[in-house]
Amino acid sequence: MCIRDSKYLVEHLYSPVRRGLMDEIDWNDRLIGIKGSRGVGKTTFLLDYAREHFGADNKECLYINLNHFYFTERTLVDFASEFRAKGGKVLLIDQVFKYSGWSKELRYCYDNFTDLKIIFSGSSVMRLKDENPDLSGKVVSYNLRGFSFREFFNLMSGNSFPAYTFGEILVDHQEIAKGICSVGKPMAYFQDYLHHGFYPFFLEKRNFSENLLKTMNMMLEVDVLYIKQIEQSYLPKLRKLLYLLATSAPCTPNVSQLSKDIETSRATVMNYIKYLADARLMNILYPVGESFPKKPSKVYMYNSNLMYPIRPMEVNMPVSYTHLTLPTT
């Protein structure tokens, strides 16, 4: 069943954008974790790797989802052992946190199946090394983010502009801008990017706003409550906190008032804000030298797309243009 599922998914994969992270990863490592917020394309990224490095028919690489009912009675260790015995070399594991004891079994596979490479995906809320000592010093983790404006612009305009380093932009920004604008008009796509360009699922033939709203709720219900083991009864408080922060962001949070609004302690409010940031729903900014559990100086939405489902009638994003001028020496 798993082999048929993997082959089908790789064969029918629609992935028009090759993510830059693909070239940043050292694929020689034997245990690789791909973290990212819900909706940024972690599953697609794993399948992209399979298609690019092995193809759909090569049984040396296999994609599995640990949220499958198959793994309610079959252990990951047993499955990996059998896969390896049949010639398997690379195991791509999705939804790893849905499997009880996943970190211990990954460590067992790492220690005992030295000819097997494991690449797994996980939520941005997960602390792979801090909260999973079994993996400390073994796993190499990377973060997959949503589309950059460059990726969105390339996709929508049919171009293939490369990424530039900050140093290259500082030194040669005028020529870079001229080269881009000579074949495309990036600002014609910018408002669309602010509205729906961060999450790759805007390409699906579904209502984007409804899909994003469902994704945000899943971030709260699964990525925060499930992973952080918070009781379901506290979900309304977490949802209300997100709404209060979103409708006032960017802001310096009044923790005392927020604790009254959601009827919980100041310490719990601070924890919730941290969890929202871990889930990539919010960004939190601290003064230099400070960090959690201190109160952040500013709280704002993680990306502009998230503002529209919460404040659809209030979002106003004027676009300003500023030319970068460097001081002469």
What are these regions (language model features)?
Residues K42:
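Conserved lysine of the Walker
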Residues I34:
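Hydrophobic anchor at the beta1->P-loop junction of P-loop NTPases
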Residues M1-D5, T322-T328:
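Conserved small/polar residues in nucleotide/adenosyl-binding loops
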Residues R4-L21:
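N-terminal pre-Walker A segment at the start of P-loop NTPase domains
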Residues L62-K86:
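Short glycine-rich substrate-engagement loop in P-loop NTPases that contacts/grips substrate
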